Amino acid sequence: MTLILGIDPGSRITGFGVVRETARGCEYVASGCIRTGNGPLHERLHVVFRSVREVIRTHGPTALSIEQVFMARNADSALKLGQARGAAIVAAMEEGLSVAEYTASQVKQAVVGTGGADKQQVQMMVMHLLKLTQKPQIDASDALAIALCHAHTQQSLVPHGLVGARRRGGRLRL
């Protein structure tokens, strides 16, 4: 039984989702959004760090799965997103968690079956897979999807003997 923490990083809103991986599939544990407010960036990053560390200490996951940065139209936004990712990753590393990174299309492919799914499709599949009766906030549902992606990826690698096969820099390299 493994607990996986998924993080959808952001400098203003960071979604988190915790799932328990069992022999019967994945079960919902917790989810929510970390709202950092409107202060200076360094204060918001500190909120992300402290809050992710608190989620880890509360729920005790052994793995963190996080979305990779994508380069959009706005380089400043991508830099802030990367810094928020860094704050979450450092919190996880300080608590001894393994870290796995996934692209948005990998997450969508693993959860919905197509890398081009929209946020509502991801949200509906997360609800279905985790048997949720209410829609989680969109950032929280993205984080749950990232955790589910990690669980599905690990399950598909086990039969091939690839889990932990080659790790460099904290990422599984295939």
Swiss-Prot record:
Ligand binding (Mg(2+) 2): 67
Effect listed in the UniProt record for changing residue 70 to A: Does not cleave HJ DNA, altered binding of HJ DNA
GO BP term, example: DNA repair
Keywords, comma-separated and alphabetical: Cytoplasm, DNA damage, DNA recombination, DNA repair, DNA-binding, Endonuclease, Hydrolase, Magnesium, Metal-binding, Nuclease
Effect of residue 73 to A: Does not cleave HJ DNA, binds DNA
Residues annotated as catalytic: 8, 67, 139, 142
Cofactor: record remark: Mn(2+) is a poor substitute for Mg(2+). Binds 2 Mg(2+) ion per subunit.
Catalysed reactions, as listed in the record: Endonucleolytic cleavage at a junction such as a reciprocal single-stranded crossover between two homologous DNA duplexes (Holliday junction)
Protein function: The RuvA-RuvB-RuvC complex processes Holliday junction (HJ) DNA during genetic recombination and DNA repair. Endonuclease that resolves HJ intermediates. Cleaves cruciform DNA by making single-stranded nicks across the HJ at symmetrical positions within the homologous arms, yielding a 5'-phosphate and a 3'-hydroxyl group; requires a central core of homology in the junction. The consensus cleavage sequence is 5'-(A/T)TT(C/G)-3'. Cleavage occurs on the 3'-side of the TT dinucleotide at the point of strand exchange. Complements an E.coli deletion mutant. A C-terminally truncated protein (residues 1-153) binds cruciform but not linear dsDNA, the consensus cleavage sequence is 5'-TT|C-3'.
General remark: Probably part of a ruvC-ruvA-ruvB operon. Does not seem to belong to the SOS regulon, no LexA binding site has been identified in the promoter region.
The protein's name in its UniProt record: Crossover junction endodeoxyribonuclease RuvC
Organism from which the protein derives: Pseudomonas aeruginosa (strain ATCC 15692 / DSM 22644 / CIP 104116 / JCM 14847 / LMG 12228 / 1C / PRS 101 / PAO1)
